[in-house]
Design a protein with these regions (language model features):
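N-terminal hydrophobic/helix-forming segments and targeting peptides
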Residues: 1-372
Length: 372
């Protein structure tokens, strides 16, 4: 019998994690999953993720680095510090017992995800319908965004500098939005195209209204009605879109997936599953030997460019400030600290899918519940 064969002392054993979990382990697994589902349901933009992490970190005793710099407060082993950049990138530190130049232990992940962004002047009317003009951010399958309930998340900065947080489409009483598609009876030509060409990026316009304002003398009555609704609720005018950053994301909560609740369906798991678990791990660290860091950044989906991506000098500048508050700043200290550090830069991979076995090599693929 196969089961009676002697196990090799040299070969790798592929065990299923579920077989190894104790009842206590299983309880912890599903409690973590529930916390993660709640996080993924509420935090659908990089700004929302960073705000959540900052709030939790402050409750856990982390201090804002900028406040410490202004107070010229020295850092010692065990101190907890965070630095934030433009509300879209955050780094958390627990100061170690050993000198910073001995290196740091770093976890890294990104908190941005593929999505649709509103353009600077997005609202327009066409044939009695109000729409929002968008462009896509990151790598998306354009056809997946058709006829899906969508929500708007973001911030608007008004002319007087007031910042307004916007979330529409998540509460039960909220409307949702969507990108329209063709009826199957009208899609003969569309169906002949490849998946990549069947939906053009320029057609990913979000339908947001169809009722005209009660004034027959004005032009673009449906658009004007949408502007009135936004003004009544948020006090904004059309010009405020120019200084807004509004993201279009799938509406609705993350959910357990499968009869056995063994999987999770959520928008943005690339790479927030790594960001969330890195943050959870960071919250358990107290007085390490080496300084520990969790670095959660923006802009990975478009090449890590820009002020809040890893092409910026945010991390190096933050390490320099940390070294200064530890009382041992020098260019050489920073260089040694970075050179001697070790980092796990985590991102997601696809598990082997029996529906598409041709795109993966089983011997090198990851499997649900088993890893690689």
């Amino acid at each position: 019998m196969e089961d009676n064969k002697k196990k090799s002392p040299f070969a790798k054993e592929y065990e299923i994690a579920w077989d190894k979990y104790s009842q206590k382990d299983l309880k912890n697994v599903f409690e973590l999953a529930d916390r993660y589902i709640d996080f993924m349901s509420r935090c659908k933009t990089e700004r929302e993720c960073v705000e959540e992490f900052r709030n939790r970190a402050e409750k856990a005793g982390y201090k804002n680095l900028q406040d410490l710099i202004e107070a010229n407060k020295k850092l010692k082993a065990g101190d907890k510090v965070y630095a934030e950049l433009m509300g879209k990138t955050i780094a958390l530190f627990v100061i170690g017992k050993r000198p910073l130049e001995d290196g740091m232990l770093i976890l890294g992940a990104h908190v941005d995800s593929p999505r649709l962004d509103l353009k600077q002047n997005p609202l327009y009317e066409d044939t009695g319908l109000a729409l929002l003009d968008t462009h896509y951010y990151g790598g998306i399958k354009k056809y997946q965004w058709m006829t899906m309930p969508l929500a708007l998340h973001g911030v608007i900065v008004k002319k007087d500098g007031t910042k307004i947080n916007v979330v529409i489409g998540e509460d039960d009483g909220d409307p949702v939005f969507g990108v329209s598609d063709l009826l199957i009876h009208l899609a003969k030509d569309q169906m002949k195209k490849s998946l990549a060409e069947g939906v053009e990026g320029e057609k990913l316009n979000v339908l947001v209204g169809s009722i005209p304002i009660n004034d027959k003398k004005v032009k673009n009555r449906v658009k004007q009605n949408i502007l009135k609704i936004l003004n009544d609720k948020y006090g904004i005018v059309e010009e405020d879109f120019v200084s807004a950053e509004i993201e279009v994301v799938p509406a609705g909560r993350a959910r357990h997936y499968g009869f056995d609740n063994s999987m999770i369906m959520a928008y943005g798991q690339d790479d927030r599953v790594c960001a969330y678990t890195s943050f959870e791990a960071m919250m358990e660290i107290e007085k390490p030997e080496k300084t520990c860091v969790t670095l959660l950044v923006d802009k990975e989906e478009i090449g890590s460019v820009g002020a809040t991506g890893m092409h910026s000098r945010f991390f190096e500048n933050t390490v320099a400030e940390i070294a200064n508050l530890m009382g041992n700043y020098s260019e050489l200290t920073i260089r040694r600290a970075l050179a001697n550090s070790k980092m796990i830069s985590s991102d997601v991979s696809a598990a082997f899918d029996p529906n598409y076995p041709e795109v993966m090599e089983k011997q090198s693929a990851a499997f649900f519940g088993k890893g690689i």
